[in-house]
From Swiss-Prot:
Organism, scientific name: Pyrococcus horikoshii (strain ATCC 700860 / DSM 12428 / JCM 9974 / NBRC 100139 / OT-3)
EC top class, as a word: ligase
Name of the protein: Lysine--tRNA ligase
Keyword Disulfide bond included in the entry's annotation: no
Cofactor: Zn(2+)
Primary subcellular site in the record, as a coarse category: cytoplasm
């Protein structure tokens, strides 16, 4: 099957016509931390642009920061004194943490740094700068000239939604009072560049559209941007794409006011965290950021989460055991891509998903240290980073001859596994090696089996996990010991739990003499 990004790219070429350069856009209001749900907007635009580039076209990806929006409410994690700034542009509200020029910049810079780590090329633009330097002046004036047409379009959809029509004194723009920097009521337009306003403080005056104090309202601003930048594609959340939404009105406004066609759009679903109720909200603070994912995932896996899901499918990120499954799935797709492992009928789509997931496509299969096993090894206190690498080599998980690139990836995964165990691993995955054998009842048959395994280990300095696994099963089977009794006894002896990691590979990772002593209940 064709990957969904390639399908949309082909549709753009077909419906927008052949061009040397296409423009894709994404946009976010930095009213709080920009979370993994917000990122889906940017990545959807990016991956479609990526598909267009792969077809030989030049692409400009604009990401619009709507930092000229009003500061509407004080988030939980912000001092309540910030209520004094309500109604001001968020680009002019001070940073509560004192590390950036403004409230908006605090959140924008963090997200920009996070996106850069994913190898995503994007042109970040700032609405506050564009308005203040008069970039949109002509389009704003045109919106005033076409005010009646805009009201007609909006009222048509308001009537369908059984909402009252816009008041007669409605204008397609708002004014930020030059003195108090709050939204002011527009009283009059002189038919040219001047607008008369009255601010909540009672102050009245005239302001020039070109001064940067006049800002279009959202339902006009969005189609104006499409026209100004020649946007060919912009994804949107379903709240913007339902019947009568801002996309529907925007399609008509761009045509009737600016004489152009609306870009193609694509609805994307929400991104949530498994086990968390409700939507993430940057202003509420119940969010997971890209930087949180970077603590446990390689950059390619972060991109893979979004690339593998069609945009109309909700994503639930499982930071618990789901992380182990995600690594397993990604590693399998990577092996299929490099022809190391066979797949099924969807090989083409899987290979394309891998291509679109990688910030920089590797020329060969770089060593894959199984994350599931690393989550076990990082809990063994006697193993250093180099020891872990040696265990992986000895047990056949990675090759003996490691390149610099191989070593870097393995070490990265070791650190990511440590972070995962510390922050997200369920309690039944965590364990610690008991310093002394616990007092447990051991039947005579089990004791004999343990002694036989200890003797086998004494006689085998080198062995494979498969050989060791066979011995563990054979000694128990020969004595009629049930797997449940046998394995639970061994787990209790080493980690004090009924269950644990895969036993053969786990015990083979421990010091051999320690395992022998513990099996003999000597220490």
């Amino acid at each position: 099957m064709v990957h969904w990004a390639d399908y949309i790219a082909d549709k753009i070429i077909r419906e927008r016509g052949e061009k040397e350069k296409y423009v894709v856009e994404s946009g976010i209001t930095p009213s709080g931390y920009v979370h993994v749900g917000n990122f889906r907007e940017l990545f959807t635009a990016y991956i479609v642009g990526h598909a267009l580039r792969d077809k030989g076209y030049e692409v400009r990806h604009i990401h619009m920061w709507d930092d000229y929006d009003r500061f509407r409410k004080v988030p939980r994690n912000v001092p309540q004194e910030w209520k004094d700034y309500l109604g001001m542009p968020i680009s002019e509200v001070p940073d509560p943490w004192g590390c950036h020029e403004s409230y908006a910049e605090h959140f924008m810079r963090k997200f920009e740094e996070e996106v850069e780590k994913l190898g995503i090329e994007v042109d970040f633009l700032y609405a506050s700068e564009l308005y203040k330097r008069g970039e949109y002046s002509e389009e704003i004036r045109l919106a005033f000239e076409k005010r009646d047409k805009i009201m007609e379009i909006l009222n048509k959809y308001r009537e369908i939604a059984k909402q009252p029509p816009l008041p007669e004194n409605w204008w397609p723009a708002m004014v930020y009072c030059p003195e108090h920097r709050r939204e002011a009521e527009i009283i009059e337009w002189d038919g040219g560049w001047k607008v008369k306003y009255k601010c909540p403080e009672g102050h009245e005056g005239w302001v020039d559209i070109r001064s940067g104090n006049v800002k279009l309202r959202w339902r006009v601003d969005w189609p104006m941007r499409w026209s100004h930048f020649g946007v060919d594609f912009e994804p949107a959340g379903k709240d913007h794409l339902v019947a009568g939404s801002s996309y529907d009105t925007g399609k008509e406004i761009i045509k009737e006011v600016y004489g152009k066609e609306a870009p193609l759009s694509l609805m994307y679903e929400f991104v949530g965290i498994k086990g968390q109720k409700g939507k993430m909200s940057g202003s509420k603070g119940n969010v997971i950021l890209l930087s949180d994912l970077y603590e446990v995932l390689e950059p390619g896996l972060v991109r893979f989460i979004y690339a593998r899901h069609r945009p109309n499918k909700e994503i639930k990120i499982d930071l618990g055991l789901g992380i182990l499954n995600l690594y397993d799935e990604f590693d399998k797709v990577e092996r299929i891509y490099f022809g190391v492992e066979g797949g099924k009928g969807d090989d083409e789509e899987l290979r394309r998903t891998y291509e679109l997931s990688m910030p920089k496509k590797p020329e060969r299969l770089v060593a894959q240290a199984p994350f599931r096993f690393l989550a076990v090894l990082v809990q063994l206190p006697h193993l250093t980073e180099e020891d872990i690498i040696n265990v992986l080599i000895k047990q056949g998980h990675i090759p003996r001859d490691l390149s610099k690139e191989d070593v870097e990836r393995v070490k990265l995964r070791i650190n990511l596994a440590r972070n995962w165990v510390k922050k997200y691993a369920p309690e039944d995955v965590k364990f610690s090696i008991l310093e002394k054998p616990p007092e447990v009842e051991v039947s005579e048959d089990v004791r004999e089996a343990m002694n036989e395994v200890a003797e086998w280990l004494e006689n085998h300095e080198e062995f494979s996990v498969e050989e060791f696994n066979n011995i563990l099963f054979e000694v128990a089977k020969r004595r009629g010991i049930s797997s449940r009794e046998w394995f639970s006894t061994l787990y209790r002896l080493f980690i004090g739990k009924e269950r644990g990691p895969r036993l053969a590979s786990f015990l083979a990772s421990l010091d051999r003499s320690f395992v022998i002593k513990r099996l003999r209940l000597e220490g």
